Amino acid sequence: MSFELTPIPVNDDILDAVASGSYYSPHSVLGAHLGDDGVTIRVVAHLADAVDIITPTGAYAATHERGGIWVAALPGKEITAYRVSITYGEDTIVRDDPYRYLPTLGEMDTYLISEGRHEDLWKVLGAHVKTYTDELGETTGTAFAVWAPNARAVRVVGEFNYWDGTQTSMRSLGSSGVWEIFVPEVGVGARYKFEIQGPGGNWFEKADPMARATEIPPATASVVTDYFHEWTDQEWMQARRERNVHDGPMSIYEVHAGSWRQGLGYRELADELVPYVKQMGFTHVEFMPLAEHPFGGSWGYQVTSYYAPSSRYGTPDDFRYLVDAFHREGIGVILDWVPAHFPKDEFALARFDGTPLYEDPDPLRGEHPDWGTYVFNFGRREVRNFLVANALYWLEDFHIDGLRVDAVASMLYLDYSRKDGQWRPNQYGGRENLEAIEFIQEANATAYRRHPGIIMIAEESTAWPGVTAPTSGGGLGYGMKWNMGWMNDTLRYLSEDPVNRRWHHGELTFSLVYAFSENYVLPLSHDEVVHGKGSLISKMPGDKWQRLAGLRSLYAYQWSHPGKQLLFMGQEIGQEQEWNESYSLDWWLLDQEGHAGVAALVERLNKIYASSPAMWDDDYTGFEWIDASDGDHNLISYLRKGSDDAGNREVVVCISNFAGNPHEGYRVGLPFGGEWVEILNTDSEEFGGSGVVNVGTIIAEDTPWNGRPVSASLRVPPLGAVWLVPASQVR
């Protein structure tokens, strides 16, 4: 006795929705489903002439049911592995079926995503290559998952389906807002996007917010990638976990990867930039944002793919190679991170599922008036999760040693760059963005918990209290903060003609009033050499010699001032032109003696700094004024103090003359008697100076001065700095 098996019936309207790729649960219709009298298998095969289902026990012909959907009823009481044979005219292909696979996200994953607490978000969302094995062999493909809670339907499209998303519509994983599908035979290098049907029924294409690789701009597709790099920095990473970054030197070289030298990718930078930074003595390099951005003129500060290193310079593994190369040379890597805002490009995060999803829906909070960008909705837990996990991603997957967080002030204040009537107070009537504060605290606390030894740095331009105070005490939890006040005051002072500086002496000394209220970085960054501001050397008054001397005195002052220091690329060679991201630095300047001298000075400053705890000990006990009040001579002098690993106390006497004339026999009070030696003089001929130096041993005299028991008479060069140490301290 025989009888014909009947497929499990499905409503025609649902079949039509599935066929068009607009059904929220295609896996409930397509794929294999066990019924009372057998197994029903439905597949999508538009324009096919014939479809067969191949199982371990044989092949079964499918019949065309409706709108490109084919169905077969198989005998049996359990679902087995199968493949699909599809005939188009004279051609037949055999492929695996995306709709026979279970979700690649577990219930715990979707729960944590819904709660905004999935710290490893990049491991479950985005595109991930996976391999499965069954009775018919091995299948490798890519699992796609995207968060789009307000979408009516989502499809993944790419070269693998001829950009026809009706063959690969994704399933909704319930209230999590996640859509998911595993697509067999899609591997590394495949380009893809998501087609999203918004609440209004319109379709639009979006790049993957969690993409870990992208096409080279201006192309905008996401790219499937995987992780193949084998790290060689185990010694560095172990030491990082055990050290406190505050208890050591930190001299940062800020770099724009595309214009340090034009045409270099990540691997070429490993060959050229790494040895250069090593030679110059910087302890860290800080890259301007490398997350993918469509417009090069944004310098990376308008990010569209937060999880993808810019493909302009190579692959994600190429970037890992670069970081690895820095670590092998003992150099830390800091990355600029931009969680404050994102651009309105239609292919990216903006109105991602047809609604304000990543951006704040309130127009008085959701747009940045100065930059024409959207502001993240820090009050939405899934958005906070996206950003917190992003910070962890760079720290974990790329071994980044720190993140410099851009535009923190714009997050903290609801009225930032807004006039009256353009902002709405918080629940207490204040201008503080309480949700942003919570996000910042969460991001910092989580980063330090997951990755001991890293550093989170705030670019925060206001007097917000407790930026570097721990979150446990109500602080924002950053490890360091850019000292914008020091930078502004110092550059304003040095832009004055030396004749007039006596009237601006307070601008030079004011920073020491608050120097120990936070953990500071002293930044001479890219922001000071763009938008018509000129280069650092162009800010100095006088002729070429005076401008070079002024630049050298600035650097000596910066390196000896409490705080860590940061210098933007090109300024170490006295770059004369304002920075332009479209051109390489003017390396030919090193053929000129004066510019080569500036570079030699920066190299010497870093060498002295790294070997002298007195210069990087940022405790308030490590600084003492000798004379802060000699404004008539444009002179300041102070002590830096610290202890080496053996507990030996070190001192460095720092004298800076910002006047255009030298001082012969200038008396300076010293902390104790004995022999002293000059370890740095920015007017030395080797740095391009005029040679007003102190040769040989300097003997402290029993002449009280500056409130000190002894003193010495010195030669102090014009527009120059002198550093002295006890002769016994020279090693």
Where are these regions (language model features)?
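Substrate-binding/active-site clefts of carbohydrate-active enzymes
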Residues: 211-221, 227-252, 256-432, 698, ...
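C-terminal beta-strand-rich structural cap/linker in extracellular carbohydrate-active enzymes
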Residues: 78-82, 188-191, 696-731
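Beta-strand-rich binding/interaction modules
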Residues: 41-43, 48-59, 146, 151-166, ...
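The feature marks proteins involved in alpha-glucan
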Residues: 1-36, 64-148, 173-254, 261-264, ...
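Conserved alpha/beta catalytic core and glycan-binding cleft of carbohydrate-active enzymes
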Residues: 218, 399-401, 419-584, 589, ...
